[in-house]
C-alpha cells in the first residue's frame, strides 16, 4: 500500500471534515439532543408531579368527603335532637294546657255545685217555712220569714 498524495489529500480532507463537523455541526446536534433529553426529563418529572398531585387531590377529596359526611351526620343528629326537643316541649305544653283546662273545669264544677247547694238550701228552707206555716196555720211576716230562712241556710 502506497502512501501517495491522493491518500494524503483524502486524510487531510477527512481531518478538515471532522474538524468542521466537530466545530460547527456537532455542538448544535449535541445541544438539540440535550434539549430533547431535558424536555423528556421535564416531561417525566411533570408526569410524576402530576401523579403525586393527583394522589394528593384524591386524598384531599376523600378527606373532604369524609368531613362532609361527618358534618351531614352531625346536622342530622342535631336536627333529630331538635325534633325530640320540640316534641317534648309540645308534650309538656299540651300536658300543662290539659292540667289548666282540668283545673278550670274543676273550678267551674265546684262553683256550679256550690250554687246548686245554695239554691237547694234556699228551696229546702222555703219548703220548711211553708210546711211550718201550714203546721202552725198562721202566717209569718216577711221579715221573720227572711230571718228564719237565713238561719236555716247558715245551719245547712
From Swiss-Prot:
Intracellular or extracellular location(s): Cell inner membrane
Main location: membrane
Recorded topology in the membrane: Single-pass membrane protein
InterPro entries, per the entry: ATP_synth_B-like_membr_sf, ATP_synth_b/b'su_bac/chlpt, ATP_synth_F0_bsu_bac, ATP_synthase_B_chain
Transmembrane intervals: 7-29
GO molecular function term, any single one: proton-transporting ATP synthase activity, rotational mechanism
CDD domains reported for this sequence: ATP-synt_Fo_b
Signal peptide positions on this chain: none
Keyword annotations from UniProtKB, A to Z: ATP synthesis, Cell inner membrane, Cell membrane, CF(0), Hydrogen ion transport, Ion transport, Membrane, Transmembrane, Transmembrane helix, Transport
One of the record's GO cellular component terms: plasma membrane
Family: Belongs to the ATPase B chain family.
Function: F(1)F(0) ATP synthase produces ATP from ADP in the presence of a proton or sodium gradient. F-type ATPases consist of two structural domains, F(1) containing the extramembraneous catalytic core and F(0) containing the membrane proton channel, linked together by a central stalk and a peripheral stalk. During catalysis, ATP synthesis in the catalytic domain of F(1) is coupled via a rotary mechanism of the central stalk subunits to proton translocation. Component of the F(0) channel, it forms part of the peripheral stalk, linking F(1) to F(0).
Quaternary structure, from the entry: F-type ATPases have 2 components, F(1) - the catalytic core - and F(0) - the membrane proton channel. F(1) has five subunits: alpha(3), beta(3), gamma(1), delta(1), epsilon(1). F(0) has three main subunits: a(1), b(2) and c(10-14). The alpha and beta chains form an alternating ring which encloses part of the gamma chain. F(1) is attached to F(0) by a central stalk formed by the gamma and epsilon chains, while a peripheral stalk is formed by the delta and b chains.
UniProt cross-references to HAMAP family, sorted A to Z: ATP_synth_b_bprime
The protein's name: ATP synthase subunit b
Amino acid at each position: 500500500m502506497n502512501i501517495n498524495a491522493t491518500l494524503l489529500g483524502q486524510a487531510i480532507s477527512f481531518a478538515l471534515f471532522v474538524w468542521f463537523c466537530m466545530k460547527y455541526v456537532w455542538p448544535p446536534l449535541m445541544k438539540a439532543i440535550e434539549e430533547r433529553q431535558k424536555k423528556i426529563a421535564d416531561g417525566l418529572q411533570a408526569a410524576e408531579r402530576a401523579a403525586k398531585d393527583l394522589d394528593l387531590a384524591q386524598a384531599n377529596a376523600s378527606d373532604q368527603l369524609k368531613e362532609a359526611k361527618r358534618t351531614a351526620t352531625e346536622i342530622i343528629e342535631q336536627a333529630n335532637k331538635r325534633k325530640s326537643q320540640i316534641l317534648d316541649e309540645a308534650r309538656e305544653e299540651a300536658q300543662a294546657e290539659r292540667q289548666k283546662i282540668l283545673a278550670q273545669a274543676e273550678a267551674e264544677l265546684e262553683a256550679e255545685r256550690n250554687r246548686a247547694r245554695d239554691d237547694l238550701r234556699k228551696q229546702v228552707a222555703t219548703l220548711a217555712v211553708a210546711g211550718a206555716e201550714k203546721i202552725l196555720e198562721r202566717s209569718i211576716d216577711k221579715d221573720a220569714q227572711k230571718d228564719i230562712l237565713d238561719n236555716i241556710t247558715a245551719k245547712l
